Amino acid sequence: MSILVKNNIHWVGQRDWEVRDFHGTEYKTLRGSSYNSYLIREEKNVLIDTVDHKFSREFVQNLRSEIDLADIDYIIINHAEEDHAGALTELMAQIPDTPIYCTANAIDSITGHHHHPEWNFNVVKTGDTLDIGNGKQLIFVETPMLHWPDSMMTYMTGDAVLFSNDAFGQHYCDERLFNDEVDQTELFEQCQRYYANILTPFSRLVTPKITEILGFNLPVDMIATSHGVVWRDNPTQIVELYLKWAADYQEDRITIFYDTMSNNTRMMADAIAQGINEVDPNVAVKIFNVARSDKNEILTNVFRSKGVLVGTSTMNNVMMPKIAGLVEEMTGLRFRNKRASAFGSHGWSGGAVDRLSTRLQDAGFEMSLSLKAKWRPDIDALELCRQHGRDIARQWALAPLPETNVKATTQEEECACAAAAAADLGPSMQCSVCQWIYDPAKGEPLQDVAPGTPWSDVPDNFLCPECSLGKDVFDVLATEAK
């Protein structure tokens, strides 16, 4: 089976309706995928890429029905990964001397996967051309680390088609090939999901590479990707989206995700979200339980967000395994221009929230104060969670927010705060390690230190909520020192 792309270019790839895991289990392909291979018939016959190795036999059989394999003059491999070049062994068994054009790095990868160093490799670099007859040429553009070292794109003059490799693609299987034929909302979602989960680590390379390609001043009538649709209707729309996504992208959105053992951390997540929306009803807030949610949807939402709140219960003094794994993936994705805060519940001892805060900071997030609750949050602890959400909403606001008056939850709390404010409670104290501030008027309810407790009356076993160090590391807050 083949599909006419344009003039003498046909799609000869393979749809994969059933695939649900990609790159091991790193990427959930909930809408399947396709492996796009293209056959060009000019004076010279050119095959661009193959398909995933599991479809090798079907691919060669289908290709044979389109063309005598011996008539293929050149094979172009834009990318050596197995979902692109996987059928090479099956194909080259039939036409072993056919020239293969690829980057130098691709030769290393292809021979590493297929173990045929004797194949007729021809190295190409940016700006190299290959004459295919009828006044047309292929122009090669290296795109290293988008997303492998061997990656390149191929441009066909005359027809003005850019064979873009993984860039501008999506794991999206449909019986229709072109972007104007499919559901536009689904297509946009899958494009963004693909960029967020695969190309985000290389965003710093995207803009200069697109700028380099545009600098050739070549018309682009179509973008033929390696996965998903071919962009024939306004193909530059996806290029414009990539330029936007590569520029430290964020929306007015906050993502909250958590894992919980006894529902306590979930209660905290809900209360924090309530506090955020009290202060800023316009910010989009989405909550995920990592044990019940699609991991790649969570990461896509993190990509879209200005900030993320991550919650975990404490298990053996460390964070929950699913949270640890997801934070490790976030580290690899190298998100930029994002803020973060950790929260969670614990029992007799903690540890997870501090560990999580450190990991998020190591992942490149700008950190805000964390929040902890001991055992199941009661009405007072949940109010602290809501207040944390209010504080986060103001700290992370993209524009100044109007002041709002939030009622105290109980009359007793109002009295306590008023009394604390009126009393001479002595100075606030600041942790010399993590800079957390103890305010005597507020106390530290999570350690049973009531509002209005002077520092001298704070128990000796008090621990800094942020770094878990004792009272001896605290100094008088500099602004209050006399």
From Swiss-Prot:
Keyword Iron: yes
Record keyword Nucleus present: no
Pathway: Nitrogen metabolism; nitric oxide reduction
Residues that bind Fe cation 3: C431, C434, C464, C467
Subcellular location: Cytoplasm
Region: Zinc metallo-hydrolase, residue numbers: 30-210
Co-factor remark: Binds 3 Fe cations per monomer. Binds 1 FMN per monomer.
One Pfam family from the record: Flavodoxin_1
SUPFAM superfamilies: Flavoproteins (SSF52218), Metallo-hydrolase/oxidoreductase (SSF56281), Rubredoxin-like (SSF57802)
Family the UniProt entry places it in: In the N-terminal section; belongs to the zinc metallo-hydrolase group 3 family.
NCBIfam families xrefs: PRK05452.1
Known function: Anaerobic nitric oxide reductase; uses NADH to detoxify nitric oxide (NO), protecting several 4Fe-4S NO-sensitive enzymes. Has at least 2 reductase partners, only one of which (NorW, flavorubredoxin reductase) has been identified. NO probably binds to the di-iron center; electrons enter from the NorW at rubredoxin and are transferred sequentially to the FMN center and the di-iron center. Also able to function as an aerobic oxygen reductase.
Full protein name: Anaerobic nitric oxide reductase flavorubredoxin
Species annotation: Citrobacter koseri (strain ATCC BAA-895 / CDC 4225-83 / SGSC4696)
Taxonomic lineage of the native organism: Bacteria, Pseudomonadati, Pseudomonadota, Gammaproteobacteria, Enterobacterales
Gene coding for it: norV
